[in-house]
Amino acid sequence: MTARRLIISPNWIGDAVMAQPLVQLLHKEDPHSPIDVLAPTWVAPVWRAMREIDTVIETPLKHGKLQLGHRWKFARQLRQRGYRAAYVLPNTLKFALIPWLAGITHRIGYKGESRYGLINRMHHDDRAAPRPMVSFYAALAHAPAHHFAHPDQLPKPRLHLDEERRKKALDETGVQFGKPLIAFAPGAEFGSAKRWPTTHFAQLAHIVRDAYPEADIVLLGSAKDHDVCEEIAAQVGPKVKNMAGVTTLEQALAVLASSDAVVSNDSGLLHIASALNRPVIGLYGPTDPDHAPPFSDVAKTISLRLSCSPCKKRICPLKHQNCMRQMEAQMVWDSLRGMLAS
């Protein structure tokens, strides 16, 4: 029996997508050795959309909590599955405990919180010049080295939904087949600084509706984004459907996979849409578009690159959020129009 390999998932949806090239590299290296993932429940649907993954083991572990009893429970479960290697993607000591407790021989990851002993094939990152996320994770497929592959040298992150699953999930949402579909993702888990203003999303929706009156516009996000999306829907009217907090992540995957174009802040949904290879426009303000750009074949990154950005702050420290506010709806439409026309 071929020994299995295990990936310990990050807590963030976008980070899980950025780790997909690592999965492709591991599968190419040994296609007969199954790859499993230990993932939080809210991230698990992303891993299930990766063809190279064999089994996704869901955990109730909460972000920032030690929950030592739960970690020991999962370690015992993993010990029985016979893993030869574990790739620990989060940088915290807590996640490195699990494969160590499970007795997995090779434990690969970054130094993180001084995880000496818990990680025994240790990689190091330059915090002064952090790598692009896909390069950061993909480096774990090889022996530790000072150099790393540029994103252009790596496989692109890719997710796949089979047609039956996609149609079933779409039926559950009430989204109609055969009509032009544009998805907006106005939320941002990281913080309010990353959000394009609701007024701007509403202006863009009006422009889209005037140009394509037959199109459906859907607003996607988590329950935390519902009120933000409701503000947009209230400004636009019934042609916009607020699905934030209503859909499961798997249903959101199906909607994104069926969209003719996606406009999103720098969020997990942007990276899902990109990995599904949909035409996407990513709106970047306080974050660096070169650190985690979209990788779909048709993609546009919009960033004003003001002198104060990327500040990487959750809330604008200058109180004006000009990096997002000065990004006008017409500017976004100029890119979106070409995507919809083609």
Predicted regions and their residues:
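Catalytic machinery of carbohydrate-active enzymes
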Residues: 1-342
